[in-house]
């Protein structure tokens, strides 16, 4: 007893029990949404238990009629047995269908909810997790939660009802037989203790290892070209073998413990079963019970044992549930983005749709969570019909600046606002809500699988073919698209497959232009274009009648002389370059 108290106190000090309780409450918040489905599933399960119990009783009567221990109508009893067998089949199938239907519904709704919460989670916090880990949590852990919500409490009620009803019948006919049937319970509970102690730790390690392997596979398949180019095939296959070996060793260590426990519990089960069988034979030999009663006892003995085992199995299921809940809580309880300005931004955009929207930044400072300071008192401005260039060495903060503009990152101090009006005095603070005012073309290939037209309509579902072609012309992509056999219906493979890097960039720019957002952000989005095409694309954007503000980051100064202003990001500030400095950069390039 003293050791148990010490163990409980140890868990309390470590916070394990409080954590499990918090995780249980979190699961309950989801579970109460589906109480009607849980009641339906429970009623079907209880009904099935009742039909099964009735079948055992009728089977007893049928055996006794055949052996002459009981008088009655053989045909009617046999018909009743068949009827209950059919009823059991129908209830079982109905329960299975309801379980599948409800499980799919609950699983999809919970995954949608978790997915939506992940998307509005603070971006910098979310990047602390590997995408493979996030996908594993969203898919495996969310499925575990949905399955547990539907099954755990209903099964607890169903198995308990099955156990109590079977025990009541056995006690009515022979209390001693019930004692034999229940002999295995304390042994099962005792032997399951060491397994349960290790189970939570093993489940945590297993979930982490699954996420690690998923992330490895995802990165490998996404970078097959690089793996081949650097002749890293052997290296990556060996890394996979190492990960698999670690996973196998971890699982086998736990499995050995499980096998030992299972063997011991099976031995106890055999002892209990044969004890019941021997006691039944003894009672029949003494004419204390009939053959039918003995067959019923043996049947109900199995029901009692299976019910206890099922109830015991709910414990590791609960442990697995709380672990999955904890892994999901790690994500959904991160800081959430604030979209309270949605309505204000919508009105702002409507009011200034014809005149355009720009942005102003004053004395902005930003430091990453890691402690790296990127900006200190930086200032910048960009207005409609302007092309603003951001230049500077790699790692100085150009991409970070665009993330701040998109409110993916939040500055610690300073003013950062969108602006409009003739003197730019109408302003609204930057927030996640202002993202709808931006079109963003990031570095790299951002095209999705599907046709060119489908890619364009991802950002504007109701756009016409003519509008798509016009956007392609602005980005200089129509030059090659019109030569394709299927035109805008041509297939784009995964990661822009089937098109060169420069072509994919022009398609990405066309998609951004098609959205008709007031502000366009191009992050090295013309790096794969030749100088002439790059200049033509930017000039087309400038000459477009739509009042657009354009901000580009670039390492190539060859287009700087067509930009309205050029900001050099250096020494944690944004400094406007004069014409002499720009010309010097162009000559030195």
Language-model-detected regions and their locations in the chain:
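Membrane-integrated ABC transporters
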Residues: 1-51, 67-80, 95-99, 103, ...
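An intracellular "coupling" helix at the cytosolic face of ABC transporter transmembrane type-1 domains
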Residues: 28, 36, 123-124, 140-149, ...
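Juxtamembrane loop-to-helix connectors within ABC transporter transmembrane domains
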Residues: 31, 99-100, 119-164, 222
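Transmembrane helices of ABC transporter permease
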Residues: 33, 37-50, 54, 61, ...
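ABC ATPase nucleotide-binding domain helical subdomain, centered on the C-loop/LSGGQ "ABC signature"
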Residues: 112, 116, 330, 415-417, ...
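Cytosolic ends of transmembrane helices, especially the final helix of ABC transmembrane type-1 domains
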Residues: 232, 256, 304-334
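ABC-family ATPase nucleotide-binding domain "signature/switch" substructure
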Residues: 400, 439, 444, 455, ...
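Helix-to-loop junction immediately C-terminal to a conserved catalytic motif
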Residues: 406
